[in-house]
Amino acid sequence: LDISLLNGYWEIQSVKQDNKLLKTYPFSGIIDYFEIKNGKGLRKKVMPKIDGKFEASLHKIDFNISQKNGKTTLEYIDKNNTFIETIAKLDSTELFITNKENYIYHYKAYEKLNFD
C-alpha cells in the first residue's frame, strides 16, 4: 500500500455496515483532508469554496500510521480518546476505511468545482 496516495482531499461517497448500505452522499459540502509526514498524519474537515480554495473547520485530529501483517492502520489521538481505522483499499481515485464497528467508509478523490 502506497500511503503517500492518502495525501490530499477525499470526498465521502457512502457508508456501509455488515454489507448493508447505510447512507450515500450524492454531494458533500465537507471534504476530508489528509496530510502524511514521517509516519504521522493529520486529518481535517474542509469546505470547498467557489474560488477553488478551501475553508478549514476547527475539526482536526492527528494520527500515527502503522503497517503490520499487511494491514495499514491509522491510530487517531484525540484529547481523551484513541481509536483505530484500517485502510482497506487506497489508490489514486478511491479510499476505503474500516473500523472496529464494521463500518466501511467509501471515499473518492475530490475533484475541484469547475464553473467554466
Positions of the model-derived regions?
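N-terminal helix-cap/turn-to-beta initiation motif at the start of protein domains
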Residues: L1-E11
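Short, solvent-exposed coil/turn segments at beta-strand boundaries
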Residues: L6, Y33-L42, Q67-K71, A88-L95, ...
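Short, solvent-exposed loop/turn elements at domain surfaces
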Residues: Q17-L21
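N-terminal glycine/threonine-rich, aromatic-flanked beta-hairpin/loop signature
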Residues: K23-F63, N69
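Well-ordered beta-strand positions in beta-sheet-rich domains
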Residues: Y33, K60-N64, T82-I84, I104-H106
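Short beta-strand segments that buttress and anchor functional surface loops
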Residues: T73-D78, L95-T98
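Short, exposed beta-strand-loop hairpins at the edges of beta-sheets
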Residues: I84-I87, S92-H106
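C-terminal partner/receptor-binding element of secreted or periplasmic proteins
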Residues: N102-D116
